[in-house]
Amino acid sequence: MKTLIFTLSSLQLIFLPQLSLGNYLLDEILHLSDVDQQQLSAVTRITNASNYFGFDLYNTLKGSGNVLISPYSLSCAMAMVYLGSRGVTEREMHSVLNYGSFGLTRDDVRLGFQQAINTLTSNTIGYTLDTANALLIQRSFEVQEDFRQKIETDFGAEVREVDFQSQTTIVQQAINTWTAHKTQNNIQNILKEPPDSNTLLFFLNAVYFKGFWETTFDPKQSTIMKFYNNGSVSTDTVMMMMESRLPFGYVESLNCLALEMPYQGRNVTMLLLLPVSPNGLPELEQALSPASISLIYSTLRKRRVKVFIPKFKLEEEYEEVLKEGLSDMGMKSLFGFNANLNGITEDTGLYVTTVVHKTSIEVDEEGTVASAASGVGGGWRSATPRFMANHPFLFFIRHSETGAVLFMGRVSQL
């Protein structure tokens, strides 16, 4: 028996101020005063667990080249599986997903994601955020009714019986049509190929984000400049330029420049981290943690800064390397015959064979996703500091009210 988990995070950003990444701030907690305290505690802890899981996973995937993952998207898909896990499989997932570190029970996970999903998809002034959750089951496969109800109620997911064995093309078309509908046609052809005919469970989480910058780039200012791939080999790229008052700072302990780029509505922000040294990204990655992000925000001060960000598009897909990474992190039994998913079905022999995570980002004068830079010929000490994204940098896109990191990644080569 096979189980396929598929998470797609599709991101297109359009370039339009000032939020924080990391733990909740007091005003953010007060802003959620209409939420039951138990639910508030759960959503706070579930987003923290998701963010820490994202950092842990990033460290297993970073290798070389570009990286782009959605901690929220993948955590959401894995949480649906977790709710159906039992025994050793449950304990392993509980640990790897950082639920234990934040004292999250099974009910906390349900309540946390339920509230996070509701908050993420409401009050989206100035940006678009569409999510889609689904669980497709082989028709001959009986799902526990209690599990079905929790997935539908808490994750807003649709649970459907399909025939993977003889109607894979029809299933592919149905998934693509459904996802396009749920994301207002922003995500199309999510499956390029039909699912494996041996698939019994198909978990899908899709996220689409499109944000407008509060302060826009002028396309007339864009020019061809050098970007140093992997910190050394130069290539010509279109560099967008602007001068504006933005949260900016130098983080001495990390030897990097930090810039915060807000979107309209002030509920989503991008944090860019640029090593001062063109070859300093490995050291920055090694020193960085969710806790250090809070330190970074404490160093930011709103000031006039010259910003240079490359225009680019990233598309990444993780399959075997993701499965290996999760296994190395301690999620071992889930991917073998010893998996215990009795919360999904009473049948034995069900395990996960494939985990797929697809992400995409597009950056242009109207939108952004990843940009960072360190000034060659300029820096944080000048009268008007420069943030010159002409060598590898990191970025984080985060929803302030829930604290969820929607996307995080690295631009290493263009």
UniProtKB/Swiss-Prot annotation:
It is found in: Secreted. Glycans are attached at residues 48, 230, 267. N-glycosylated. GO terms for molecular function: serine-type endopeptidase inhibitor activity. The keyword Signal applies. InterPro entries: Serpin_CS, Serpin_dom, Serpin_fam, Serpin_sf, Serpin_sf_1, Serpin_sf_2. Residues 1-22 form the signal peptide. Coiled coil: none annotated. One of its GO terms (cellular component) is extracellular space. The keyword Oxidoreductase does not apply. Specifically expressed in hemocytes (at protein level). PANTHER family: GH10112P-RELATED (PTHR11461:SF211), SERINE PROTEASE INHIBITOR, SERPIN (PTHR11461). Belongs to the serpin family. Serine protease inhibitor that inhibits clotting factor G and to a lesser extent proclotting enzyme and clotting factor C. This is Intracellular coagulation inhibitor 3. The lineage of its organism: Eukaryota, Metazoa, Ecdysozoa, Arthropoda, Chelicerata.
